[in-house]
Design a protein with these regions (language model features):
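A short glycine-rich, His/Asp/Glu-containing loop-to-beta-strand
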Residues: 5-36, 94
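Short strand-coil-strand connectors
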Residues: 23, 59-63, 86
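Short, conserved beta-strand element in jelly-roll/cupin
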Residues: 31-33, 43-58
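Histidine-centered metal-chelating micro-motifs
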Residues: 37-38, 57, 73, 77-82
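Short, surface-exposed secondary-structure edge patches
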Residues: 39, 48, 63-65
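A cytosolic small-molecule/anion-sensing beta-strand core signal
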Residues: 52-53, 68-69, 87
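Short acidic-glycine-tyrosine-enriched beta hairpin
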Residues: 62-77
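Ligand-binding loop in jelly-roll beta-barrel domains
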Residues: 77-101
Length: 103
């Protein structure tokens, strides 16, 4: 498999993900346009997010923080979170179990 051959899917306005699913996890490389909003939500999946480039304001359980390159955020199952990209961003997300709705 070559990441360059995976066509990105627009999951939300401004969120373009190259998505790979394993048996028990999902891996997503996001390209996010400046000003794109991630509405507050929660899901059963555990999530680990790594910011490769750009800057976003991310809120987890009501606590907002500015995240830039090198930031890692661990999001436990069923925890409310949201965000907005302050610049164009590239982010790597890993989810377990699989994000079935992204298939």
């Amino acid at each position: 498999m070559n990441l360059n051959n995976i066509k990105p899917k627009e999951i939300l306005p401004g969120f373009y993900g190259k998505i790979i699913h394993g048996e028990k996890m999902s891996w997503i490389l996001w390209d996010i346009k400046k000003g794109s909003k991630l509405p507050e939500h929660r899901h059963v999946n555990e999530q680990i997010m790594y910011v490769i480039e750009g800057e976003l304001e991310f809120t987890l359980n009501g606590k907002a923080s500015i995240c830039g390159p090198g930031s890692v955020i661990v999001i436990p199952s069923n925890q409310a979170h949201s965000g907005i990209s302050r610049t164009s961003c590239q982010i790597l997300d890993v989810f377990s179990p699989v994000r079935e709705e992204y298939k």
